């Protein structure tokens, strides 16, 4: 794996750590703060611009007790100052006291700005008939 691909994969991992920690502060550091960025959560409407995206994360974090990710099937491609990551989010979350396991296919697009990779696009789509792989 090339150096840029490694840095992008590390930033992608940090995105999921911020999500697991329900940390808007960590999430803020990972996103480009402009009006033309996009976020699509599974089953939600399109959010455009950092302020709307930030509010969507606050809503998710305030309504989530616990969430854990195991990321698999990761593909990283770098095209100059833009990178695309496609991965499977193997999610374990707590809903009404019950553990729920689900899968989401995600596309995360990053732009390199001042040697830092920032999210400019996140799209998650639920996997129908999800079967959790044998992972720990």
Model-derived segments and spans:
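A beta-strand edge to alpha-helix "cap/lid" segment located at domain peripheries
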Residues: 2-32, 36-136
């Amino acid at each position: 794996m090339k150096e840029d691909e490694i840095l992008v994969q590390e930033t992608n991992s940090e995105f999921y750590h911020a999500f697991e920690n329900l940390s808007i502060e960590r999430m803020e550091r990972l996103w480009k703060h402009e009006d033309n960025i996009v976020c699509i959560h599974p089953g939600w409407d399109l959010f455009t611009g950092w302020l709307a995206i930030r509010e969507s994360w606050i809503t998710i974090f305030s309504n989530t007790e616990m969430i854990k990710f195991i990321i698999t099937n990761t593909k990283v491609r770098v095209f100059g100052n833009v990178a695309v990551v496609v991965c499977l989010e193997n999610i374990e979350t707590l809903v009404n006291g019950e553990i729920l396991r689900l899968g989401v296919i995600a596309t995360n697009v990053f732009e390199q700005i001042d040697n830092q990779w920032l999210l400019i696009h996140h799209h998650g789509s639920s996997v129908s008939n999800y079967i959790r792989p044998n992972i720990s």
